[in-house]
Amino acid sequence: MSSGYSSLEEDEDFFFTARTSFFRRAPPGKSRSGQPDVEKEKETHNYLSKEEIKEKVHKYNSAVTDKLKMTLNSNGIYTGFIKVQMELCKPAQPSPEPSSGGCMNTLHISSTNTVGEVIEALLRKFLVTESPTKFALYKRCHREDQVYACKLSDREHPLYLRLVAGPRTDTLSFVLREHEIGEWEAFSLPELQNFLRILDKEEDEQLQSLKRRYTAYRQKLEEALGEVWKPG
């Protein structure tokens, strides 16, 4: 669908859930005083006790207005929805599916899902075949009429950030973007060389696909011309 929305009433084939990977949890520490700052970049998950999670999930669900509530399991893992704005420059390759550029996608994930897994899930859903390393997930925060965008680490957990910030997207929202040119400077030379190999492979695949299409088209055209000029 062009909106990228996955409804609970839709057929299972169209309801997309990111693959869940379970990580060894760090022992829960004491809760931080005050509201956590959603603008501060974190490398790892800020783990809460089961009681703190239960309280926050209840508070979150009480504030939900679109029925996209979170569900808390007995093991302390919770599931819920995040909305991601797809701000891609162009489709990675021709596809009969609607373009993902500029649409809003609702994704059902677990509290154990990382940013890296969310990126991979979104790219799979929109049939984007380019490497996930070419994309980044940003959190967009709104504070006092100011908008702040911060790129998230691959090890962060988007659903935790959503839980802490609450359900309002005008307070916190997520955006998927392609890496800007200047951001490639952060990668090592072997990584950049690997990206080039991936691009070369994608370019070759596109070229071979184009050649096959035009070869088939030429063959059909020649067959049609042969039928026209065949003696009666």
Swiss-Prot record:
GO terms for molecular function: identical protein binding. The keyword NAD does not apply. PROSITE patterns: RA, SARAH. Residues 37-46 have a biased composition (Basic and acidic residues). Gene3D superfamilies: 1.20.5.110, Phosphatidylinositol 3-kinase Catalytic Subunit, Chain A, domain 1. Residues 181-228 form the SARAH domain. Residues 78-180 form the Ras-associating domain. Pfam families: Nore1-SARAH, RA. GO terms for cellular component: cytosol; microtubule; plasma membrane. GO terms for biological process: signal transduction. Transmembrane segments: none annotated. It is found in: Cytoplasm; Cytoplasm, Cytoskeleton. The modification N-acetylserine is found at residue 2. Keywords: Acetylation, Cytoplasm, Cytoskeleton, Microtubule. InterPro entries: RA_dom, RASSF1-6, SARAH_dom, Ubiquitin-like_domsf. Residues 25-46 are annotated as: Disordered. This is Ras association domain-containing protein 3. It comes from Mus musculus. The lineage of its organism: Eukaryota, Metazoa, Chordata, Craniata, Vertebrata.
